[in-house]
Regions:
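Gly/Pro-rich active-site capping loops and adjacent beta-alpha segments
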Residues: 38-39, 168-170, 174-180
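Short acidic-glycine loop/turn motifs at beta-strand connectors
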Residues: 29-33, 62, 162-164, 171-175
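Conserved, charged catalytic cores of large soluble enzymes
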Residues: 1-31, 105-144
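Function-dense linear segments that define catalytic or interfacial modules
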Residues: 16-118
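Coil-to-beta-strand transition motifs
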Residues: 22, 164-167
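Internal maturation/activation junctions in enzymes
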Residues: 75-95, 99, 110, 115-164, ...
Length: 180
């Protein structure tokens, strides 16, 4: 295990962040150690200050069938809902805004790889459209049913553009190829 100096992935990401600004790390020390709350990401925007979003990504490059994809989206959406119940937050106001909005951001990554596996051009096509319909419908259905089960507010948002630089780089997938 060891310290951060032994973590190759972390060091690779830090080097790239220093060179390009991606992935979007937030280091809160030194002059920034007293920062209260910041949102370095812009995948999901909100009119509410103090809003939070629980982000995650489904990796299309590793999914082989529509049934498997439906299951991944279903479980991923439920997982993100549970994250809104368990995450510790820094301020009471953030808890209140989270309860009001329960903002989720299930993204898709590996779209480029998915297209290459199927020898499809990088454009919207009939097969991709079917997958995106499942993504839209199942993410909302699963999240709403799970929220209703716990008698909590339904999310105001379900999906986000992904992968972010951070998630894509960590997973070793192409970043900034998002079809939404």
């Amino acid at each position: 295990v060891g310290g951060l100096e032994n973590n190759e992935i972390f060091l690779k990401n830090v080097r790239q962040a220093m060179e390009t600004g991606e992935p979007g790390f937030s280091f809160n020390f030194g002059a920034k150690q007293n920062e209260t709350l910041r949102n370095a990401c812009t995948e999901v925007t909100s009119e509410d200050d103090s809003d939070v979003c629980n982000l995650g990504s489904a990796n299309l490059g590793n999914i082989r069938s529509l049934d498997e994809f439906r299951s991944v989206v279903h479980l991923g959406s439920k997982f993100l809902v549970c994250g809104t119940l368990r995450a510790d937050l820094p301020y009471e106001k953030v808890y209140k805004v989270r309860e009001k909005n329960r903002r989720l951001g299930l993204g898709l990554m590996g779209i480029h790889e998915w297209l290459l596996q199927r020898q499809l051009p990088y454009e919207v096509n009939e097969e991709l459209t079917k997958w995106l319909e499942i993504y839209e419908n199942e993410s909302e259905k699963a999240a709403n049913e799970h929220c209703d089960r716990f008698y909590i507010s339904r999310p105001v948002a379900y999906r986000a553009i992904a992968p972010t630089g951070s998630i894509g780089i960590l997973a070793g997938y192409v970043v900034a190829c998002s079809v939404q």
